[in-house]
Amino acid sequence: FRLARLFILVDVSRSMETHAQLFLRIARAFVQAANARVFVFHTRLAEVTPLLLRDSKNVQEKINAVTAGFGGGTRIATSVADFHSVHARAQLGRSSRVWVLSDGFDADEPQRLNEELGAVRGRGARISWFHPSPQRPASEAMQLALPRVSRFLRLNSLRDLAEAAEVLN
């Protein structure tokens, strides 16, 4: 039996400001308990796993420093492409789980998110999309990418996380 390799991609764009702190705390718990790798993105992708491993109360400030100057907008497809082609290329496989924590608003061309998530799925990874609103993300990019995502789950509180626990394997 082989444990699933968990990758968490956290949207830290302006539209996610009010949710990013919760998402990063949850991601940190999975780094510490499940050896997850965590990446943050808005216009670019950056791995923050080493920062989340540190015992520091200033993690949010350090992550803000890492992402400073990324610019406006959210480039989810570009970030997913960087994730699967550079950062996790050798580690993605059938036992991989990729969690995207985002509202789904993407400044890239709408069809590109479908293509990039398709590349992740093509490696055998299962994709779960966690979003902060009661309904599924409705952007054009998300509508096109629906077939690539195994499940959509609301994540706006620890209660939501507890309710999602049974499907997170």
Predicted regions and their residues:
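MIDAS-like acidic motif and immediate structural context at the N-terminus
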Residues: 1-24
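Structural beta-sheet core signal
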Residues: 8, 38-40, 100, 129-131
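DG-centered beta-turn motif at the end of beta-strands
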Residues: 10-13, 95-108, 150
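Metal-dependent catalytic core segments for phosphate chemistry
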Residues: 18-75
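A short acidic, amphipathic alpha-helical/loop segment
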Residues: 22-26, 112-119, 141
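Von Willebrand factor type A / integrin I
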Residues: 117-169
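Von Willebrand factor
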Residues: 51, 58-96, 134-140
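Extracytoplasmic/secreted cell-surface and envelope-processing proteins
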Residues: 48, 108-111, 163-164
